[in-house]
Amino acid sequence: MSILEKVQPIETMLPERYHKMSKEDMEKRVHEIKEKMGKMLFIPGHHYQKDEVVQFSDAAGDSLQLAQVAASNKDAKYIVFCGVHFMAETADMLTTDDQIVILPDMRAGCSMADMADIEQTERAWKELTKLFGDTMIPLTYVNSTAAIKAFCGRNGGATVTSSNAKQMVSWAFTQKERLVFLPDQHLGRNTAYDLGIPLDKMAVWDPHTDSLEYDGDIEEIQVILWKGHCSVHQNFTVKNIENVRKNHPDMNIIVHPECCYEVVAASDYAGSTKYIIDMIESAPSGSKWAIGTEMNLVNRIIQQHPDKEIVSLNPFMCPCLTMNRIDLPHLLWALETIERGEEINVISVDKQVTAEAVLALNRMLERV
């Protein structure tokens, strides 16, 4: 059975009439529907969403915050999730059976989540077990499919976010001697290193060659990193940092831990989306910042803090393209179909997958 037990009906083409509507008319209709539906409708929005979408969010946050609000909301019948596919899956798994989760555009995926599929993961686990026996525990970044979360759940593991990665990695080492971290090698490496694990005690599993890449003694490997990454944060480089240091020596550099180890090591600060937002918020007026994260968020931070000099670490950075698929026309389309009693782009995860994935999610949520 497919992980998505049903996605009824699957709609990917926005009706033509939404292309012809003015922004003002669309905004007016969204306001009308939100007012009409009241608590029956809940719209969570990720920080990386466009301003035209975030303005209508009932809750804006990073992956951890949105997982928490999804789990705590018991009033809404409809949850229209303005994020990407894995986030909507998580919302469906953490809400009740009578709550309906809708993703405005089914094309809003995540390339990182797609870098670890369940067949690859099961195969990797089998091969790694031959090497290390029953000494491993899996952790997966929430930026992963429901199937990968379920794999971690049934193998004693948990999910993590960039906000709680250190806490969850520390917990994992109270359970087993070794950690398998999926699917983002950079978050896993940066977190483990920050906790005092040297690089030569980390290895990388390549799912395309089914091979383990390492430099040190295999017996001393503590962390096995999945060879995946975020296509947005991969674009920040040490060269970007060198340019900022040269041209703006008094500028602080803050990056997301999905950036590679070399970039994080060369930066002044590194932390989750919430950490970055809070750091800029609390910084003194007149301070200068180069931020290494998604462009929609950077632009919003710039707008919110005119008293500070803020730039993107990479001046040629673009937004997360899949996150950007959720726009005002798609949001309105989803809301108007609900208003008519129709349901498009419903996310409904298979119940067995949900049961196992929720084990992993709850092991995280009960510790944060």
From Swiss-Prot:
State the superkingdom: Bacteria
Relay the cofactor remark from the entry: Binds 1 [4Fe-4S] cluster per subunit.
**InterPro entries membership:** NadA, NadA_sf, Quinolinate_synth_A_type3
- What keyword terms does UniProt attach to this protein? 4Fe-4S, Cytoplasm, Iron, Iron-sulfur, Metal-binding, Pyridine nucleotide biosynthesis, Transferase
Top-level EC class as recorded in UniProt = transferase
What EC number(s) does its UniProt record assign? 2.5.1.72
Task: Report the principal subcellular site.
Answer: cytoplasm
Q: Where does [4Fe-4S] cluster bind?
A: C110, C230, C320
Q: Which cofactors are named for this entry?
A: [4Fe-4S] cluster
> Where is this protein localized, as stated in its record?
Cytoplasm
The Swiss-Prot or TrEMBL record annotates one GO molecular function as: 4 iron, 4 sulfur cluster binding
Catalysed reaction equations from the record: iminosuccinate + dihydroxyacetone phosphate = quinolinate + phosphate + 2 H2O + H(+)
One GO-annotated biological process of the protein:
'de novo' NAD biosynthetic process from L-aspartate
Any one GO CC term of this protein is: cytosol
Q: Where does iminosuccinate bind?
A: H46, S63, Y141, V142, N143, S162, H256, P257, E258, T273
Pathway field of the UniProt record reads: Cofactor biosynthesis; NAD(+) biosynthesis; quinolinate from iminoaspartate: step 1/1
NCBIfam families per UniProt: nadA, PRK09375.2-1, PRK09375.2-4
Q: Which HAMAP family match?
A: NadA_type3
Q: What does this protein do?
A: Catalyzes the condensation of iminoaspartate with dihydroxyacetone phosphate to form quinolinate.
Family, as annotated: Belongs to the quinolinate synthase family. Type 3 subfamily.
Q: What is this protein called?
A: Quinolinate synthase
- What organism, scientifically named, is this protein from? Bacillus cereus (strain G9842)
